[in-house]
Each structure stands twice: as structure tokens, then as C-alpha cells.
């Protein structure tokens, strides 16, 4: 058995810029998509990472009546740690949290994702940030209504 075959795997739910597989592969070159998943009770939002007005991005926003969508990736635990480091988890900019997703068969799937732990705002992301979100969303079979919701979230940011 090779070293890579023995490496521990993790799963990561991408709902923002990392929906774009090229963006995901930049940080996690071994990441493999497992499919579209949904997360009930949340929507995607944008926020500043604490008090720094220069740093902001996607975050989870509790929304009891909403279901959001994204892509679940399988990746080595080492690459998930690398993603955390690149995201500034150690500085408190983002936090890795455990969530429970639902697949297209209705089965519950545990996963990790990133969110901003102490969101501040407002944050208006530049097009260089939102374009990969939309490109990624359109590359997967996400519900058309959800893509419209993303467009509206971006427009209102």
C-alpha cells in the first residue's frame, strides 16, 4: 500500500469560492468532488473577518427556512489543515466547523466547512471574489432557484 493510499481522508463542504474546482485544487490539489449536498437552516452571506476591513469573505448565516447547496470534496487531512492555514484559522479569521449535510438520497453526511467565527460587516466582495462563486455554482447541478438566490445575495452585498 502506498503512503497516499494510507493517508487519512477528510471531507470539506464548499459553498463559496471553493465551489470552483480550480480554486479548490489551488489549495487542495488532491481534492475530489463527491457530489452536490444541501445544508438546511443556513444561507451563504458575506462578512468582514472581525474588525479588519480588508479581510472578508463567505460565511454561513443561520436562516431557519432556507436550504443552501454546495459541493462535498474528499481530501487528505493534511490538505484540510493546509486549507485552514491558508484561510487564517490560526488568526481567528475563519473557523473550521462540523456540519451535517443531506445528499440527493436524503442521507445525512457529516462534513467540515469554513465560516467566519466573529462576522462583522457589511462586506461588499469584489467581482474577483464573486465570479468564482458563480462560475463554480454554474458548473455543478445546483438548483436554478439556488443560483438565483446566490445572485441576489451578491447583488445586495
Identify the role of each PLM range.
Residues 2-157:
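Glycine-aromatic micro-motifs
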Amino acid at each position: 500500500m502506498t503512503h497516499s493510499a494510507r493517508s487519512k481522508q477528510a471531507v470539506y463542504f464548499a459553498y463559496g469560492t471553493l465551489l470552483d474546482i480550480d480554486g479548490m485544487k489551488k489549495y487542495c490539489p488532491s481534492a475530489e468532488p463527491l457530489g452536490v449536498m444541501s445544508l438546511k437552516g443556513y444561507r451563504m452571506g458575506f462578512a468582514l473577518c472581525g474588525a479588519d476591513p480588508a479581510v472578508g469573505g463567505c460565511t454561513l448565516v443561520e436562516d431557519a427556512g432556507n436550504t443552501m447547496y454546495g459541493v462535498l470534496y474528499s481530501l487528505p487531512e493534511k490538505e484540510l489543515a493546509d486549507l485552514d492555514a491558508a484561510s487564517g484559522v490560526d488568526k481567528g479569521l475563519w473557523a473550521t466547523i462540523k456540519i451535517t449535510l443531506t445528499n440527493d438520497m436524503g442521507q445525512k453526511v457529516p462534513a467540515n466547512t469554513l465560516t467566519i467565527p466573529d462576522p462583522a460587516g457589511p462586506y461588499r466582495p469584489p467581482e474577483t471574489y464573486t465570479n468564482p462563486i458563480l462560475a463554480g455554482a454554474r458548473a455543478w447541478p445546483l438548483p436554478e432557484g439556488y443560483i438565483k438566490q446566490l445572485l441576489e445575495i451578491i447583488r445586495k452585498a
